[in-house]
Amino acid sequence: MGKTGSVEHTKQRIESELMPPSMYKVILNNDDYTPMDFVIEVLARFFDKHEPQATDIMLTIHHQGKGICGVYPFGIAETKVLQVNQFARENQHPLLCTLEKA
């Protein structure tokens, strides 16, 4: 009887090891003060977006209130959020970067 529990535990552990990591959307939120050019710079610098794609995302942020910059595993998403928010504050902009589960 003891083996059944052990087999189930091993099966659950293997299944959890095979699961892909949870993914998170990194989002830029609109505000009335951050210049559009700065948002484009953030998208290029931190998310490797070329100007046409960065402009499209910036316009989505402007018109819809937020835009997705990318989808990443939690650790990467969290780092990008921290980097963007720090960069915005260093440049005296209220731009807010957040993450949510994809």
From Swiss-Prot:
<comment type="subunit">
    <text>Binds to the N-terminal domain of the chaperone ClpA.</text>
</comment>
<dbReference type="InterPro" id="IPR022935">
    <property type="entry name" value="ClpS"/>
</dbReference>
<dbReference type="GO" id="GO:0030163">
    <property type="term" value="P:protein catabolic process"/>
</dbReference>
<dbReference type="GO" id="GO:0006508">
    <property type="term" value="P:proteolysis"/>
</dbReference>
<dbReference type="Pfam" id="PF02617">
    <property type="entry name" value="ClpS"/>
</dbReference>
<comment type="function">
    <text>Involved in the modulation of the specificity of the ClpAP-mediated ATP-dependent protein degradation.</text>
</comment>
<protein>
    <recommendedName>
        <fullName>ATP-dependent Clp protease adapter protein ClpS</fullName>
    </recommendedName>
</protein>
<dbReference type="InterPro" id="IPR014719">
    <property type="entry name" value="Ribosomal_bL12_C/ClpS-like"/>
</dbReference>
<comment type="similarity">
    <text>Belongs to the ClpS family.</text>
</comment>
<dbReference type="InterPro" id="IPR003769">
    <property type="entry name" value="ClpS_core"/>
</dbReference>
